[in-house]
Amino acid sequence: MEKKKYFISVDLEGVTDVTAWCETEKGQDGYERSCLQMTSEAAAACRAVLEAGYDAVVRDGHDSARNLRHELLPRGVKLMRGWACHPGSMMAGIDGSYAGAIYIGYHAPGGSNGSPLAHTMNYKVIRSVKINGKLASEFTMNSLYAAEQGVPSVFISGDASICRLAAEEVPGIGTVAVKECRGNSTFNMHPEDVCDMIQEEVAKALRKEVAVRRVDPELELEVSLTSHQAVRKALMHPLIRQIDDSTVCYRAHSPRELNAILDYIIG
């Protein structure tokens, strides 16, 4: 039977106009406006999925995972809110029944200069993450987790840096770069233009064949941490090793295991 639903993982830092940390944190200046645009961009992806005859399931993947306005998404869209203490993290809920994964509002990885909000998972604890020697983003980890379930990653929107990195990791993936980032500034597309482009490009992506990305049998994880205390805590795990004063490593054998170790390190 043909698969009839798409999984849409939504973050906030890669949404158009979002530039400063305060705009991503509940109760801070600009947060509510950011959430409305986050919802609008997710809704644009949903419309493309629904118009193609599929169901859309949205996973709120930012901070508390309680940012999206469900009533502003198209009727029929199901929304996952909050955290389930699951190694899927921003992809918790995806399984082999999905036809593909879509990523909205994604951002450059920690350790890069691709965005003033560049980070991987928790910027207060983690400086950067590498997998098998290459700088890894949240998209890297999430698309690997989707691949473990047999699900291809078909589309991503966010800053220009993450779109370039995603295209390198998953050839053929559809992209919409909503902003260019220069130092602590962002050069943004108009919010309504962004939504139009996301809907149009997601529709195109659904008509393409994108292969499930390859998952290496061993995933050598290197995590650069922001404090000596974070390093000491990580080393309480018997299989985590120290590389230098601020970096620890772990050899995982699946994306699920890799995500679980990262959750442990963040604490």
Enumerate the predicted regions with their spans.
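Hydrophobic alpha-helical transmembrane segments
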Residues: 1, 7, 17-20, 28-30, ...
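C-terminal accessory domains and tails appended to enzymatic cores
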Residues: 4, 181, 194, 199-267
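Short catalytic helix/loop segments, enriched in acidic residues and glycine
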Residues: 22-47
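N-terminal glycine-rich phosphate/adenylate-binding segment common to multiple enzyme folds
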Residues: 81-124
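Active-site glycine-rich loop that binds ribose-phosphate moieties when present
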Residues: 123-149, 157-161
